Amino acid sequence: MIRLRRVLFLLTSVLVLTACQPPGLVVDAPQPKAEAETLRVGTLYGAQIYMSSGQGLSGFDYELAQKFADYLGKPLEMQPYSNRSELYDALAKGEIDLIAAGITESPNRRNRFRMGPPLYRVDQVVVYRQGNRAPESIEQLSGNLTVVADSAFVETLTRLQQTHTNLSWEQTSEKDNDELIAMIASGELNYTLAQSTSLDINRRYMPELRSGLVLEEKVPVVWLLPAQNSDALMSKLLAFWHQEKRAGTLAHLNEKYFGHVKRFDYVDTRAFIRAIDAKLPRYRPLFEEYAGDLDWRKLAAASYQESHWNPNARSPTGVRGMMMLTNATASQLGVTNRLDPRQSIRGGADYLRDLINRLPESIPENQRMWFALAAYNIGLGHLEDARRLAEAQGLNPSAWRDVKQVLPLLQKRKFYSQTRYGYARGGEAVHYVDSIRRYYDTLVWVDNQKPKDEPQLPDEIQVEETAASSGAEPPTAAPRE
């Protein structure tokens, strides 16, 4: 009887305590996290993924993430990470909502994350340098192959190792894939693996790169979401994907970033000389008129590097015209129609002069143009980062020959992690300036061979100007940049 009373007492106590809880309170139940006010996207640096330059932010994943944020009605907060491990940790800890970093689907990733719908497809290819032996079999890669740790390439090689037992490779977590590709071009490595799109983009300014064996074909590139508690976001992502696919946005972005790169043809000196005869006579009067205190031939060389003297030129980042101005820069310079050669050349000349004037006084007069052109390409902030790196290495930050040595370091994590403005394609800026200098030297040589007659503005240019300068830039059929 006593034991029964104790049991009844305990039950009564529990009921009383339960009744004292606030209505609706569930003890120890996990509370859902409040929805973030921004769309937090983790990414990696890369030309086709996410990058900052003198022309602003760009990249397939960046543009699509911005559109997804707009679809959700939230600001985009895009955070680049140094490597995949940090990126995956951030997603696991809830520091970001999703990963958009040009990452391919793979068995291991399917076990760890939820996969978004396919954005585009790539091949996994062997990369080697022109002049080196092209690998003809998997076995020839052994001992000569270096890949990025935690990459899908490691999974591919591990599977191949089951049937090619002698296959071996090195892994690195200190360098990203673009760095390994650059090491192939410089002859520091024999072989690496790359996505076909990445190889095509890098080959535009490292033409010695060659594509070898294809190890995987048409692998989907996807966004990654957390394995748990991501149903709502996945549902919205799928709806967004279907909407943009129907609207043609995905096809447009694929063409914008990848459709043109395979057709890239490295411009040699003979092609440039042909352009001097065929195109330059129409635009030379404009270069001479707006160059002012600049050498018009440097302005013309920069324009050729930017647009091949095509007034309707357009880059994957949305810059347009003879001098490839951004919308923001054009607005600041009073350029209402970037397709008007006169306005574009005037705007480009004014912008170059402004960059020259903003450079430190310690830079010699005869080198200021090369520094300004580098800033035109990647931005003044990244240029200042390179100058600081040069000084830290005991080099002269006001000498172009020294700064061009360290600009490619802005692509290496070890160095860009120490800078204020972070990653930049410094090697591309060096190639950009070097190309302009070669074009300039050729222009000087050609100009010295010809009579110094003052050419008149051709009638067809005047007609174009009358039509173009009377109104704003005409709209295009492409989706909004």
Swiss-Prot record:
Keyword Signal carried by entry: yes
Pfam families: SBP_bac_3 (PF00497), SLT (PF01464)
Matching SUPFAM superfamilies: Lysozyme-like, Periplasmic binding protein-like II
Annotated region described as Non-LT domain, given as residue ranges: 20-261
Region (LT domain): 262-481
Catalytic activity: Exolytic cleavage of the (1->4)-beta-glycosidic linkage between N-acetylmuramic acid (MurNAc) and N-acetylglucosamine (GlcNAc) residues in peptidoglycan, from either the reducing or the non-reducing ends of the peptidoglycan chains, with concomitant formation of a 1,6-anhydrobond in the MurNAc residue
Family: In the N-terminal section; belongs to the bacterial solute-binding protein 3 family.
Protein name stated in the entry: Membrane-bound lytic murein transglycosylase F
Species this protein is from: Shewanella amazonensis (strain ATCC BAA-1098 / SB2B)
Gene that encodes the chain: mltF
